[in-house]
């Protein structure tokens, strides 16, 4: 059973509130879950303490059991200092070729 810590949408139309839940990865986004760990209200100001509420003891327990956080939950945990978020792959899109690099250096010198 692959267990994830993720957000489940709640609230009304155009007024979302998200529950932070532990669920099997095969369950629907807003469907069955194992345990509710907290909530996230994106409509509140960013500096408001009630914007994100997590039970850190339960979160640490589930991480110790091997639960994988979703991307957004990983950001929350990184901000809280619970788990360091891995850097994402950022490939270098356009590396100049050698001759263009040499031309750019020559133009910069004089």
UniProtKB/Swiss-Prot annotation:
<feature type="region of interest" description="Disordered">
    <location>
        <begin position="87"/>
        <end position="110"/>
    </location>
</feature>
<keyword id="KW-0689">Ribosomal protein</keyword>
<protein>
    <recommendedName>
        <fullName>Small ribosomal subunit protein bS16</fullName>
    </recommendedName>
</protein>
<comment type="similarity">
    <text>Belongs to the bacterial ribosomal protein bS16 family.</text>
</comment>
<dbReference type="GO" id="GO:0003735">
    <property type="term" value="F:structural constituent of ribosome"/>
</dbReference>
<dbReference type="GO" id="GO:0005737">
    <property type="term" value="C:cytoplasm"/>
</dbReference>
<dbReference type="InterPro" id="IPR000307">
    <property type="entry name" value="Ribosomal_bS16"/>
</dbReference>
<dbReference type="InterPro" id="IPR023803">
    <property type="entry name" value="Ribosomal_bS16_dom_sf"/>
</dbReference>
<keyword id="KW-0687">Ribonucleoprotein</keyword>
<dbReference type="GO" id="GO:0015935">
    <property type="term" value="C:small ribosomal subunit"/>
</dbReference>
<dbReference type="Pfam" id="PF00886">
    <property type="entry name" value="Ribosomal_S16"/>
</dbReference>
<dbReference type="GO" id="GO:0006412">
    <property type="term" value="P:translation"/>
</dbReference>
